[in-house]
């Protein structure tokens, strides 16, 4: 695309130069015959026109030849000075070639009308419009040719065309096969770029299923398999690159982390789209799921345990040649968690995540103090007391947010037909789109937390969930549970309830 753009710019520059050469007058002055210029060999120079006239009186004929400056040509398309005069009986003629006025004019009107009409509006318009039309046609032709070449080179298939990926991906290969080969080959950092691009460029988009902070999410198909395609606008290239980079972290793949498939930049001939292809989960986000359905005790434990497992894997550092750095999510909420067909969760939207290098005790990007969703921000983020140099601080902020997600899940747990309506955390304390200051006042100054209904005390599973929540919400981040501890507690609860994950 860059090569095509450069070629187009060169073509346009050439056309402009040709047009300028065609339309701009030459630097040399026009030389005219001048009957009064005896000292200059009867020649004058002008930037306007040459003029000649003949006036017939009762006793003689007066001839006049001279230069007319451009400033005196009023109006420019049909100057008054060049028009014949019926009152004086003068016949006039203006022209724009050297010594073109050194002619004999008849004293009759027909010649003057014919000659002066040479600078009439129709002819003048034709002279000007000719080169302009040529330039426009050449320009449109050039744009059309370059556009067609670009579309052919970067075509987006409107129907599935397996022949496009046959050289790289054998017939009958599924996404599951590709991912399995990748995870068992030892790399663990995502599919090869060529395979990613091949997959992305043979996906057929089906329907838009949502919009987020950085773009739109579509359901697509590749070889009959459904995939999710997150499309970023070109101005969000940094966000797209960052999320793709995090997803391809070595050893990140986990059943409770959204399965990454491919990243590609696609040019549709008009603008560039940045694609992030992942597994498709028809239930959508946990936020959507809880709005639509209530859950059983078993369903609640599966949702909570799988979320904790995903976060524990993110937070965990795996040491070794194929190790994985510890990662903090920084924007954990029910809208960034997806529900799978089997009723478990996977964590998505890693665009704001940060990775920790334990060898140097550094974070891989300069973190912003306040990123993420205000409603889910931990107290230390809201009051700006978080220690940005200490990676554990980011993990503890994730734990606080997960406690709020657990509260959303537990409210929808139906026991004996009794359950609460779905609500966002702090729904009764702040507006629908709260500011940082409004959240800080409630969470830090008033030290309020989401209300835990009394009915939860009548169920062991809900009692355990409530205890975990409270230990996630401590104002002191160091006192909060770790993701691994929460995972173990919920695993014990699932065993007690006889739940198979």
Swiss-Prot record:
Binding site for ATP: 209-217, 230
Main localization category: membrane
UniProt keyword annotations, A-Z: Apoptosis, ATP-binding, Cell junction, Cell membrane, Differentiation, Disulfide bond, Glycoprotein, Growth regulation, Isopeptide bond, Kinase, Magnesium, Manganese, Membrane, Metal-binding, Nucleotide-binding, Phosphoprotein, Receptor, Serine/threonine-protein kinase, Signal, Tight junction, Transferase, Transmembrane, Transmembrane helix, Ubl conjugation
Motif (FKBP1A-binding): 191-192
Residues modified by glycosylation: 41
Residues that bear Phosphothreonine: 183-184
Entry protein name: TGF-beta receptor type-1
């Amino acid at each position: 695309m860059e090569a095509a753009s450069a070629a187009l710019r060169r073509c346009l520059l050439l056309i402009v130069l040709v047009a300028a050469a065609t339309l701009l007058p030459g630097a040399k002055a026009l030389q005219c015959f001048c009957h009064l210029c005896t000292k200059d060999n009867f020649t004058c120079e002008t930037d306007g026109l040459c003029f000649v006239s003949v006036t017939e009186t009762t006793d003689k004929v007066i001839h006049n030849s001279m230069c007319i400056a451009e400033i005196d040509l009023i109006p420019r398309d049909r100057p008054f000075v060049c028009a014949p005069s019926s009152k004086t009986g003068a016949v006039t003629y203006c022209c724009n070639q050297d010594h073109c006025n050194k002619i004999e004019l008849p004293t009759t009107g027909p010649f003057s009308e014919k000659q002066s009409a040479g600078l009439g509006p129709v002819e003048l318009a034709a002279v000007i419009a000719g080169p302009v039309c040529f330039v426009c046609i050449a320009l449109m032709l050039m744009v059309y040719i370059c556009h067609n070449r670009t579309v052919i080179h970067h075509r987006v298939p409107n129907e599935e065309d397996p022949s496009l990926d046959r050289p790289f991906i054998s017939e009958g290969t599924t996404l599951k096969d590709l991912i399995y080969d990748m995870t068992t080959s030892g790399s663990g950092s995502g599919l090869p770029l060529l395979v990613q691009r091949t997959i992305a460029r043979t996906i057929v988009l089906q329907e838009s299923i949502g919009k987020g902070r950085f773009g739109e999410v579509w359901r697509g198909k590749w070889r009959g398999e459904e995939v999710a395609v997150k499309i970023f606008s070109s101005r969000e290239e940094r966000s797209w690159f960052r999320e793709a980079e995090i997803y391809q972290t070595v050893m990140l793949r986990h059943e409770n982390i959204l399965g990454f498939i491919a990243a590609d930049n696609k040019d549709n001939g008009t603008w560039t789209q940045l694609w992030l292809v992942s597994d498709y989960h028809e239930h959508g986000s946990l936020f959507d799921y809880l709005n639509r359905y209530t859950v059983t005790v078993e369903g609640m434990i599966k949702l909570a345990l799988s979320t904790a497992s995903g976060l524990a894997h993110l937070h965990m550092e795996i040491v070794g040649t194929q190790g994985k750095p510890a990662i903090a999510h920084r924007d954990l909420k029910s809208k960034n968690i997806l529900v799978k067909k089997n009723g478990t969760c996977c964590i998505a939207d890693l665009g704001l995540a940060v990775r920790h290098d334990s060898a140097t005790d550094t974070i891989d990007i300069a973190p912003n103090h306040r990123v993420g969703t205000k409603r889910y921000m931990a107290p230390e983020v809201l009051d700006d007391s978080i220690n940005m140099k200490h990676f554990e601080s980011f993990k503890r902020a994730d734990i606080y947010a997960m406690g709020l997600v657990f509260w959303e899940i537990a409210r929808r747990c139906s026991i004996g037909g009794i359950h609460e309506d779905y609500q966002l955390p702090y729904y009764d304390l702040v507006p629908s789109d709260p500011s940082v200051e409004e959240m800080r006042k409630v969470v830090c100054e008033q030290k309020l937390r989401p209300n835990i209904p009394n009915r939860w005390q009548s169920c062991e599973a809900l009692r355990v969930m409530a205890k975990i929540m409270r230990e996630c919400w401590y104002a002191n981040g160091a006192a909060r549970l770790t993701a691994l501890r929460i995972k173990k507690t919920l695993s014990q609860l699932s065993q007690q309830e006889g739940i198979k994950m």
